[in-house]
From Swiss-Prot:
The name this protein goes by in its record: Proline--tRNA ligase
Function summary: Catalyzes the attachment of proline to tRNA(Pro) in a two-step reaction: proline is first activated by ATP to form Pro-AMP and then transferred to the acceptor end of tRNA(Pro).
Gene Ontology biological-process entries: prolyl-tRNA aminoacylation
Keywords: Aminoacyl-tRNA synthetase, ATP-binding, Cytoplasm, Ligase, Nucleotide-binding, Protein biosynthesis
Organism: Wolbachia sp. subsp. Brugia malayi (strain TRS)
Length: 425
């Protein structure tokens, strides 16, 4: 993509209302633009990051055996009255009345819709286990939206719903999602920690939140320092056996971990999984015939990842004083190609050759006129993993510079060598 033909409205100065670094850089790097409190337009660069995050999530969910669907964002209030949750969300839920005077709502979550989706179709244990997921926009009318996409009112979420015939099978589904989440977040370059947490308005008796450690996090986490030693193994049983809890269930009096072994950190929540048994299937009459011929309530779980929130969380984890330092897996473009002399034919010819030879959908080519300082500052701000710089030696010695954005390391290489490196890697 040529920058001269791209829409990338960056800001030089830090917006006064943006308090945390991810909010500041999201606005300055042209990822988002606010149109109302807690509501944002996703600009082209930010949308590419969202799509890359979605792609990783979709790939790992599909590998787990989950099946993608898409449920409506507008839901009938009757389903929520049936489950008994309609009044639980209070003013957080955006309620709508249509022209037929039917009560509707903009979904803050989809447990009721998911239960309704299968209750008239899935009737036998032979059809289970089943896990359906979607990537869908949701709305919660937060009292104080803040921190940009970290706590917006409209947000993109991956939510999945598992259906099982009994507790043992449901726990297997839960553990599978725990492991899948670890894989998802690690592929994004993150180091996740899964902590036991309160089930809140979703309900149930088993819940884990997934966090990344960050000083700007709103949650306080208590965990055994052995947790991260076991993370590489991705062994769910071992990870779940380690003491790691959110502050809402931590009790200093009963904590089994010695004080010197207990870590206390701030964290940003990026995912949440729940097992809630028949909380929804019972009132909504979602039953199957079990192997013994008896009708039983379906055991359910739900599993959420804040897709749009992850953009902010990743920036919190990957940035420096010049801008974002995207992990390659989620970066909007892999390479930023910078021509320092756009008015000189020899430089333009070399830059165009590099651009046409590389995979153009992975390259943002700065072919604009402007000062060298402005070009470098913009590329550092948007944080593409690699920069290819066409400077003086490109013409005289057939040499260009390759800069690693995260480390700042710069190497001089032959042009063909650089092209081969990025086309093979």
């Amino acid at each position: 993509m040529r920058l001269s033909q791209y829409y990338l409205p960056t800001l030089k100065e830090k917006p006064a209302h943006a308090r945390i670094i991810s909010h500041q850089y999201s606005l300055r790097a042209g990822l988002i633009k606010q149109i109302a409190s807690g509501i944002y337009t996703w600009l082209p660069l930010g949308l590419r990051v969202l799509k890359n995050i979605e792609g990783i999530i979709r790939d790992e969910m599909n590998k787990s055996g989950a099946i993608e669907a898409l449920m409506p964002c507008v839901q009938p209030a009757s389903l929520w009255r049936e489950s008994g949750r309609y009044d639980d969300y209070g003013k957080t839920m955006l309620r709508i009345r249509d022209r037929h005077e039917e009560d509707m709502l903009f979904g803050p979550t989809h447990e009721e819709v998911a239960t309704d989706l299968i209750r008239d179709i899935v009737k036998s244990y032979k059809n289970l286990p089943l896990c359906l997921y979607q990537i869908q926009w949701k709305f919660r009318d937060e009292v104080r939206p803040r921190y940009g996409v970290m706590r917006g009112r409209e947000f993109l979420m991956k939510d999945a719903y598992s259906f099982n015939v009994n507790y043992e099978s449901a726990l297997n589904s839960y553990n599978l999602m725990y492991k899948t989440y670890i894989k998802i977040f690690k592929r994004m370059g993150l180091i996740p920690i899964g902590v036991r947490a309160d089930t809140g308005l979703i309900g149930g008796n088993l819940s884990h939140e997934f966090h990344i450690l960050a000083s700007t996090g709103e949650s306080t986490l208590y965990y055994d320092n052995k947790f991260f030693e076991l993370l590489e193994s991705e062994d769910v049983k071992s990870l779940k056996s380690i003491y790691a809890v959110a502050d809402d269930i931590h009790d200093p009096k009963t904590c089994p971990v010695p004080q010197e072994q207990l870590n206390v950190s701030k964290g940003i929540e990026i995912g949440h999984i729940f097992y809630f048994g028949d909380k929804y299937s019972k009132p909504m009459n979602a039953k199957v015939t079990a192997q013994d011929g008896k009708n039983v309530n379906i055991h359910m779980g739900s599993y959420g990842i804040g897709v749009s929130r992850l953009v902010g969380a990743i920036i919190e984890a990957f940035h420096d004083d010049k801008g974002i330092t995207w992990p390659e897996a989620v970066a909007p473009f892999r390479v930023g190609l910078i021509n320092l002399q756009t008015k000189t034919a020899e430089y333009v010819e070399i830059a165009n050759k590099i651009y046409s030879t590389l995979k153009s959908d992975e390259v943002l080519y700065d072919d604009t006129e402007g000062s060298i300082g402005v070009k470098f500052a913009k590329m550092d701000l948007i944080g593409l993993p690699w920069q290819i710089i066409v400077g003086k030696k490109a013409v005289s010695e057939n040499i260009i510079e390759i800069k690693n954005r995260a480390t700042g390391k710069v190497e001089e290489v032959q042009i063909e060598e650089a092209i081969n490196y990025f086309n093979v890697k």
